[in-house]
């Protein structure tokens, strides 16, 4: 990695380390929640994280940025703007008017679904980089990949701000590159 790339990622890691808010026992007992809201609300920190994510997305040959509902919209939109690309909002079920394409996936206690409009956007044959704030189990990102592939798009990789270690998230993402700004490995 070049010296410029290191300084970009170092600035982003520093911003994440300084501004992330940690909440014990949320959303349930035993979980340490990493809230990136203060990172997003601080201009310098936000720019540092977006710069690093944009650099990563560019290396993955992004033609479109796919942002996952909801913080992935914020990060993905900023990355797409920085790179001069379009952004694909990958929505939770029921947020888009029909017709839609739907991909269901398993949760710990039940199922959920992601959707894209089936009209008005052509992703066939395009390299899409998926962006979100946190990689945990990888279930949502894996479902997003299946959704995009069902529309003949190609997921060229994943870019995340942080990763929760020990949840096996990367195992659910297949063989595509995963770049985490604050990588626990």
Swiss-Prot record:
Q: Which UniProt keywords apply?
A: Cytoplasm, Glycosyltransferase, Purine salvage, Transferase
From the Swiss-Prot or TrEMBL record, give the protein name: Adenine phosphoribosyltransferase
Superkingdom in the source lineage:
Bacteria
Task of the protein: Catalyzes a salvage reaction resulting in the formation of AMP, that is energically less costly than de novo synthesis.
Assigned protein family: Belongs to the purine/pyrimidine phosphoribosyltransferase family.
EC code: 2.4.2.7
Query: Which enzyme class?
Result: transferase
State the compartments where it is located.
Answer: Cytoplasm
Keyword Nucleus found: no
Query: Which GO BP terms, alphabetically?
Result: adenine salvage; AMP salvage; purine ribonucleoside salvage
Kindly tell me the pathway this chain contributes to. Purine metabolism; AMP biosynthesis via salvage pathway; AMP from adenine: step 1/1
**GO annotation, cellular component aspect:** cytoplasm
Record keywords: Transferase included? yes
The record's subunit annotation is: Homodimer.
Q: Per its UniProt record, what PROSITE patterns does this chain match?
A: PUR_PYR_PR_TRANSFER
Q: Which GO terms describe its molecular function?
A: adenine binding; adenine phosphoribosyltransferase activity; AMP binding
Which reaction does this chain catalyze? AMP + diphosphate = 5-phospho-alpha-D-ribose 1-diphosphate + adenine
Per the UniProt record, the source organism is Corynebacterium glutamicum (strain ATCC 13032 / DSM 20300 / JCM 1318 / BCRC 11384 / CCUG 27702 / LMG 3730 / NBRC 12168 / NCIMB 10025 / NRRL B-2784 / 534)
């Amino acid at each position: 990695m070049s010296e410029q790339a290191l300084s970009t990622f170092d600035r982003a890691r520093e911003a994440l380390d300084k501004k992330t808010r940690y909440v014990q026992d949320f959303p349930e007992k035993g979980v340490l929640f990493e809230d990136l809201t203060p990172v997003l609300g601080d201009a310098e920190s936000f720019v540092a994280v977006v710069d690093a994510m944009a650099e990563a997305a560019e290396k993955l040959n992004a033609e479109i940025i796919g942002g996952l509902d909801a913080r992935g919209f914020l990060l993905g939109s900023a990355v797409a703007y920085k790179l001069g690309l379009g952004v694909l909002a990958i929505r939770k079920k029921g947020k888009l008017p029909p017709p839609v394409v739907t991909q269901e996936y398993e949760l710990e206690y039940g199922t959920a679904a992601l959707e894209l409009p089936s009209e008005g956007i052509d992703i066939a044959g395009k390299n899409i980089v998926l962006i979100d704030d946190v990689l945990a189990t990888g279930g949502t990102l894996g479902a997003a990949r299946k959704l995009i592939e069902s529309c003949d798009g190609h997921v060229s990789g994943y870019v995340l701000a942080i990763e929760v270690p020990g949840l096996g998230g990367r195992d659910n993402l297949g063989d595509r590159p995963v770049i985490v700004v604050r990588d626990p490995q």
